[in-house]
């Protein structure tokens, strides 16, 4: 199952192709992605982050083995072949344990890597860029690379132990700012310089040599860089190819390497395509998919209010708001301003902190109630036209069933389609 190295080989041969990575644990987002990949007969890359999934459960409550089981069960139920499914681990390193001394944090990171590799994750992003409690800020390239090489050695040994061979594919480096969208309002963004990218690569090459890992260098398929794309709560910094031209040209000197771009959410279809052409050929997308999920659910909640007596409504939006106010830990440090500004951000921000709340039992019950209310009888076409106009066109042409679930899935797939088109190549 060498989908990624084959993709890189084709890209380096001039095909201008790429692959997108679905970074979400939401069942409806994953179903939308699996069904879309199945319909288009493409492999599907699904990634878990070190915050979502770790050996202790992460914020989803899932270990890597749990996450793999969950995704594979869903794929099986949708008749998606498991050999077309690639699982990746994102920002694997001491990220979750920055408040601990480095020795302790890295011991946890060793176990994190073991748990991901043993569970069958094949794309491993080694990211040791964050300073721990007793570290200098920022870390030098050499320290970052030494720690990454240590984790690579653990990964290789674990893979051989569990699967008889080491067939992992690695991504190294990190982007600025932190994953998941910027905390503050953005105006300008520094593109990674070619010198910084080269320094990261050379530091890692040297550190891998010291660990006796020369042979795995061709399996280091991508370097994470900042090509100048980001989003905050209400704005998107669009890709400007001219600003990334020197960086784009620099990677052409490396035979088996492309770039991986994070925070590509909300870029225009044209920008996504240009990113892939410019060798930022692994596109990460997460918040934009749960943002589309939220859009569809808010639209269905508005339709519900038109059709169902108030006392029988799910009250999804109010339940969501109440839970977010009761448990503000996932948005409080991100959303600023007066009460109204924070209220708007909770519901509508591009950074989509609401995605952390969908698993809550009260919210999940309200979601199920909403779906039941709208599944009992056909949704009137004029209301679909009003609240989900893109889906209305497909319903009218006969290509989409106007059930609540299908409307949600299709709205998410509209975003996936942009990524698929960007990655198709010539």
Curated annotation (Swiss-Prot):
One of its GO terms (cellular component) is plasma membrane. HAMAP family: Tagatose_aldol_KbaZ (MF_01295). Component of the tagatose-1,6-bisphosphate aldolase KbaYZ that is required for full activity and stability of the Y subunit. Could have a chaperone-like function for the proper and stable folding of KbaY. When expressed alone, KbaZ does not show any aldolase activity. GO terms for biological process: carbohydrate metabolic process; D-tagatose 6-phosphate catabolic process; phosphoenolpyruvate-dependent sugar phosphotransferase system. Pathway: Carbohydrate metabolism; D-tagatose 6-phosphate degradation; D-glyceraldehyde 3-phosphate and glycerone phosphate from D-tagatose 6-phosphate: step 2/2. This is D-tagatose-1,6-bisphosphate aldolase subunit KbaZ. Pfam families: GatZ_KbaZ-like. InterPro entries: Aldolase_TIM, GatZ/KbaZ-like, GatZ_KbaZ_carbometab, TagBP_ald_KbaZ. Disulfide bonds: none annotated. PANTHER family: D-TAGATOSE-1,6-BISPHOSPHATE ALDOLASE SUBUNIT KBAZ, N-ACETYLGALACTOSAMINE PERMEASE II COMPONENT-RELATED. Belongs to the GatZ/KbaZ family. KbaZ subfamily. Forms a complex with KbaY. NCBIfam families: agaZ_gatZ, PRK15458.1.
């Amino acid at each position: 199952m060498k989908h990624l190295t084959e993709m890189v080989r084709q890209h380096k041969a001039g095909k201008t192709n790429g692959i997108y990575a679905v970074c979400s644990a939401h069942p409806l987002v994953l179903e939308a992605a699996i069904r879309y990949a199945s319909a288009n007969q493409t492999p599907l890359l699904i990634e878990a982050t070190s915050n979502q999934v770790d050996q202790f459960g992460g914020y989803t409550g899932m270990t890597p083995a749990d996450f793999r089981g969950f995704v594979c069960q869903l794929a099986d139920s949708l008749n998606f072949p498991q050999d077309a499914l690639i699982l990746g681990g994102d920002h694997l390193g001491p990220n979750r344990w920055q408040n601990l001394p480095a020795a302790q944090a890295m011991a946890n990171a060793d176990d994190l890597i073991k748990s991901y590799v043993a569970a069958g994750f094949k794309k491993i992003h080694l990211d040791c860029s964050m300073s721990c409690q007793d570290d200098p800020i920022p870390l030098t390239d050499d320290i970052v690379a030494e720690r990454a090489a240590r984790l690579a050695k653990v990964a290789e040994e674990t893979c051989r132990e569990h699967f008889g061979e080491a067939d992992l594919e690695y991504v190294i480096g990190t982007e600025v700012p932190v994953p998941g969208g910027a905390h503050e309002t953005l105006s300008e963004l520094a593109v990674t310089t070619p010198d910084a990218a080269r320094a990261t690569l050379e530091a890692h090459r040297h550190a891998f040599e010291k660990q006796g890992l020369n042979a795995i260098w061709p399996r280091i398929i991508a370097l994470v860089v900042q090509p100048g794309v980001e989003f905050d709560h209400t704005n998107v910094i669009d890709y400007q190819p001219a600003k990334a031209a020197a960086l784009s040209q620099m990677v052409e000197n490396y035979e088996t390497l492309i770039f991986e771009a994070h925070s590509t959410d909300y870029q225009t279809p044209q920008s996504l395509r240009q990113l892939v052409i410019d060798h930022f050929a692994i596109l990460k997308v997460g918040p934009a998919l749960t943002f589309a999920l939220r859009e569809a659910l808010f639209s269905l909640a508005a339709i519900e209010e038109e059709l169902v007596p108030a006392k029988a409504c799910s009250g999804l939006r109010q339940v969501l708001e109440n839970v977010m106010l009761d448990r503000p830990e996932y948005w409080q440090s991100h959303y600023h301003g007066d009460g109204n500004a924070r209220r708007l951000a909770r519901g509508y921000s591009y950074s989509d902190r609401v995605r952390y709340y969908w698993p809550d039992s009260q919210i999940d019950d309200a979601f199920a109630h909403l779906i039941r209310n709208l599944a009992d009888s056909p949704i009137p076409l004029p209301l679909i036209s009003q609240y989900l106009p893109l889906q209305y066109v497909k319903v009218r042409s006969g290509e989409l069933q106007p059930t609540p679930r299908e409307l949600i899935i299709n709205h998410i797939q509209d975003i996936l389609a942009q990524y698929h088109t960007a990655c198709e190549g010539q």
